[in-house]
């Protein structure tokens, strides 16, 4: 299959807007965005799920057009789910408010003229996978009035399907997305059960109010896809265990986590591949739902995050045991902080505003700032719409460089990393011998 012309493989069969199955009460018409929500650009979080074996679930149908039946099934369950996730059926009124007007979510049905294996086995799979995401949409700046949720179901010639979701980052983070996907897939599986009602808790501005710092203007992050590339790396369980054991022995850190050792290794290798190595910084995003008092439930919807970071100013700082030791120290410090009053992410946003910069842009003169989003232990591979677990879960190729995304590899204890770097840096990064030792 020639990947050079992916658009020729795609034909859009249907485009519609899915409204909530019941009207949103007037008391919930306006959803207030928090300070962290407002600090984010209007980009989507794009992800896709590949299901190679999809069987007809509409027993009473004899129509041969399976795509239309799959789409109808997903549209019906999405409509029911949007009753609880009503802000995603609305539109941005401004950078502080979502108008929950039941405008609906956009839904696309697409045919792809190749087999799923041609995409999953493609030598540049992280690029090929984007064929199942809405064209030109992933990571795009969603202007005010645009759709806050876009879904695409793609059917391959082999009979498999992919379900992709572009989920507004303005309203929720990766944990929020997983809550939505679990609820939507549960409603789809149990469509005969009318008592299954999702119960997300929209936090809004109740935790991070704008009263202290004032409202924000929407930041614009310009996409740099022409210069940045994504690489998919698999750290299998046996090699990851060996890496963890090696780091534990050399660092003195007890039971280093998968995320600690993998992010440290990626940071080290990416920094070495950079033309301007040091000083460099690694910023980890941190889910603070369980760190806030009183604790927030797992089904809390919003951007509920903070950050912690480590720095490397000389070559000794770049040794793997040192990096992991510093990561463990900083995360322990983060857990002792009041994540409302001492939230490092908010402090970074405020400081950036004062200097007229974007967050993490040239932080304190560092040559390179890398960010890491750790989704390990977030069970994306258990999202089951009725066709079993997905063969692969992917993230759309990102708009900017120097980003690491970590998640579980399928249902095991391995790690799948999505690394986004500048093209020239990536060519050096992927040849690093220490990295090659621990990936599949």
Curated annotation (Swiss-Prot):
Single GO BP term: alkaloid biosynthetic process
Superkingdom, taxonomy of origin: Eukaryota
EC assignment: 2.3.2.35
Catalysis performed (reactions): vanillylamine + (6E)-8-methylnon-6-enoyl-CoA = capsaicin + CoA + H(+); (6E)-8-methylnon-6-enoyl-CoA + 4-hydroxy-3-methoxy-benzenemethanol = capsiate + CoA
Keyword Nucleotide-binding in annotation: no
Catalytic machinery residues: 169 (proton acceptor), 384 (proton acceptor)
Keywords: Acyltransferase, Transferase
Induction description: Induced by wounding and heat.
One GO MF term attached to the UniProt entry: aminoacyltransferase activity
One Pfam family this sequence matches: Transferase
Gene3D superfamilies recorded: Chloramphenicol acetyltransferase-like domain
Protein family membership: Belongs to the plant acyltransferase family.
Function: Involved in the biosynthesis of capsaicinoids and capsinoids natural products, pungent alkaloids synthesized from phenylpropanoid intermediates in the placental tissue of chili pepper fruit acting as repellant on herbivorous mammals and conferring spiciness to hot peppers. Catalyzes the biosynthesis of capsaicin, a pungent component, and of capsiate, a non-pungent component, from vanillylamine and vanillyl alcohol, respectively. Can transfer an acyl from (6E)-8-methylnon-6-enoyl-CoA to vanillylamine forming capsaicin and CoA.
Name assigned to this protein: Acyltransferase Pun1
Organism expressing this protein natively: Capsicum annuum (Capsicum pepper)
Highest classification ranks of the organism: Eukaryota, Viridiplantae, Streptophyta, Embryophyta, Tracheophyta
